[in-house]
Amino acid sequence: MSVVKIKIESLYKIFGTNPKMGMEHVKNGVGKDELLTKYSHVLGLQDINLNIQEKSIQVIMGLSGSGKSTLIRHINRLIEPTAGKITVEDQDVMAYDKNALRNFRRQKTAMVFQRFALMPHMTVIKNVSLGLDMQGFKPEEAKEKASKWIEKVGLNGYEEKYPQHLSGGMQQRVGLARALTNDADILLMDEAFSALDPLIRKDMQDILLGLQSELHKTVVFITHDLDEALKIGDRIAILKDGKMDQDDLPADILLNPKTDYVKKFVEDVNRSRVLKAKHIMQKLNGKDISKAIKVNEDDFIEKFIDRIVEEKPEMIVVQDKQNKNVGYISSKRLSEILKK
């Protein structure tokens, strides 16, 4: 049974001299553009409701100005909301006083930024252990913990190097190691890989997924890259002009877009690379499978599409990890999915 780790309810953020007044205008139907031109206020977020599951990667995506970075900064109250409620493990984050909020930021959450945010005068190991030093850990213990995570992200031998000696990808590994060293349950990643070259970005995505399979953190990941979102997200929330357009499983974002905006967002995606057999299979219900070929439920369509073209089977049987038949895909359905 899934557990809600972070719950966001009716969240509004209006930037300006009188945000409460601005919010009333928004509730009365004033749009983002009119709010800016007529009332000189900026609509950051409008009535956001989102449940983020424990031990999952929740992707929040949208174009520039959609509100995604504003939203993630509300979780640890780097930005205060105009209205709404945020609870973490059933605790009201809005009710925290300064000390409680400070402890929450130190112990429960960690952030990884797009621009790395490393201390240029500190070595790699000092950057990674910075949070532990601020919490009062003994130097030996802080160094031991930091060394463990430096190894985990593949930076052995770079402990005494300075940030300027590292490539962008290596600097972001330092940022990730620093976040993980604090052993926080919640990892907030704001466009963490967006500034990296494509190959380095792919490496970082793989590192994150590998670590997540071991650590099972609750990760909130901001991106404007749909391919990245589909690769790493357990769920994807798409924002437009500060409003939530759709929050769904990656396969459902692709197969069942709920708005024209989401439909346009996903129209150029190579479905064979991101959809697995289990995403498109149907129940067997006594179907004759004697002439079917077999694929694993976690196989991407791309993996078996050539075989389909060559063998032209009437049906594809989908099996789980125990080789049990769990569903089927007809050639017609596969063709329809790839043509959408």
Regions found by a protein language model. Name each.
Residues G84-D92:
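Conserved ABC transporter NBD signature motif
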Residues Y162-L166, M170:
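Conserved ABC ATPase signature
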Residues S290-P313, V317-Q322, G327-K340:
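The conserved cystathionine-beta-synthase
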